[in-house]
């Protein structure tokens, strides 16, 4: 059990043995497109997406960070959480809330010039989520990533509150 009594949702595939009856052959075979969606991103795409996260994070550790860039990191935290909800990740839910709070504090400190700088303490809270995001980009199937992006899009259009479970905050 994780902190605050909330464990990440893990998907397990249950294999049921079927006899060689008519039932075993009644299910259609997966199409090529569904097999494609069950595979991870190609290495080039995953690398480009991970690099974008890391460059944004690096910029925000120096004086090149802006509220817009930190907001992109908040989106990365939420997206990583949603991919974990699809069954691909094992980060303690409280770590997501810690990273979210650290990034929000960074935005609140921004002055009129909107320059944001992530402190070393905040960096330590965001790094585990960044590592989890990297792992997900290289290992999670496309379908899980697409579903997570859809959830993120719905959240961004309909809510101003955190998508993280209240018990984690």
Give, region by region, the residue ranges found by the protein language model:
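Short Lys/Arg-rich cationic patches that frequently serve as NLS/NoLS or arginine-rich RNA/DNA-binding motifs
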Residues: 2-38
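Short intrinsically disordered, low-complexity segments
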Residues: 7, 11, 54-56, 62, ...
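Short terminal alpha-helical segments
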Residues: 25-86
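A ubiquitous short alpha-helical element
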Residues: 38-41, 88-92, 111-116
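Short, low-complexity cationic-aromatic patches
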Residues: 57-72, 111-127
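Extended intrinsically disordered, low-complexity coil regions enriched in Ser, Thr, Gly, Ala
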Residues: 73-105, 135-149
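Amphipathic alpha-helical binding modules
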Residues: 116-169
């Amino acid at each position: 059990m994780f902190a605050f009594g909330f464990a990440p949702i893990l998907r397990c595939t249950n294999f049921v043995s079927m006899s060689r009856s008519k039932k075993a052959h009644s299910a259609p075979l997966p199409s090529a497109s569904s097999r494609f969606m069950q595979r991870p991103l190609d290495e080039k795409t995953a690398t480009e997406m991970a690099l974008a996260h890391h460059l944004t994070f690096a910029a925000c550790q120096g004086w090149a960070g802006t509220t817009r860039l930190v907001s992109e990191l908040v989106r990365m935290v939420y997206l990583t959480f949603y991919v974990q909800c699809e069954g691909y990740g094992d980060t303690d839910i409280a770590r997501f809330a810690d990273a979210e709070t650290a990034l929000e504090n960074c935005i609140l400190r921004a002055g009129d010039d909107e320059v944001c700088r992530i402190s070393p303490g905040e960096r330590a809270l965001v790094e585990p989520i960044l590592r989890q995001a990297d792992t997900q980009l290289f290992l999670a199937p496309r379908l899980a990533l697409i579903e997570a992006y859809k959830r993120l899009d719905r959240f961004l259009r309909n809510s101003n509150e955190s998508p993280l479970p209240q018990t984690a905050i």
